[in-house]
Amino acid sequence: ILGLIFLSHAASSAVHEVKEGGSIQAAVTQAQSGDVIRVFPGTYHETVYVDKDDISLIGVVEDGQWPHLDGQKILNDAILYSGNGFSVEWFKITHYKGNAIMGQSGNNFSIRNNWVIDTGLYGIFPEFGHNGLIENNILSGIEDAAIYVGMSDYVDVRNNQVFDNVAGIEVENSRHVLVEGNVARNNTGGILVFITPGLPIKSSYDAIVRRN
């Protein structure tokens, strides 16, 4: 069982490696802006908070085995981020009570190639974000929305698969959003774009839904 390994990455950044038995949160705590955290296959029972800018969480998939964040129906959230320039890729996330990946005011984010199953109310939920990409994720068994873009601007939702959820993709009170190339099946609602009254951002426009 290994903890953290630090490798040189560039003059101003580093690569941190986490293996089964180690803590992803410990790596985030030690990381500086611009660092990459590589997480190897194994099961991790934790909530990861990222409040620094330009942090990348990259899962390493080996022989079909993924890094697996498992909330055991005890933890509320898997990954919470508020830093700008955040990216997360190649994680399996299951059995949380609230959210798989939730952003609060983080801009320039990228959420790609994740497998999200049975994570409570929401799967991927950026809120108050600008300039984001949600791409090539698979989400199922979500109690509310698998992908929920809330009060955000310039977000692309592309080539995701959402099935067996209450809602597949929701865009709420957001502007300049592209929803394209996704597959939504066996959801109560497939793709929804709407305005909810009483929220801080009152408008929704330039939402393009095509070729889904």
Task: Describe the predicted segments one by one.
Residues 1-6:
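Bacterial N-terminal signal peptides
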Residues 9-13:
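Sec/Tat signal peptide C-region and signal peptidase I cleavage site
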Residues 14-45, 49:
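Acidic Gly/Asp/Thr-rich repetitive segments characteristic of extracellular carbohydrate-active
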Residues 17-20, 41, 54-97:
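Right-handed parallel beta-helix/beta-spiral solenoid domain characteristic of secreted/periplasmic
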Residues 39, 56-59, 86-89, 108-112, ...:
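All-beta strand scaffolds that present successive hydrophobic residues in beta-strands
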Residues 44-50, 66-68, 72-78, 97-103, ...:
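Short glycine/acidic-rich loop motifs that flank beta-strands on beta-rich extracellular proteins
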Residues 93-134, 138-140, 153:
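A generic tandem-repeat structural signature
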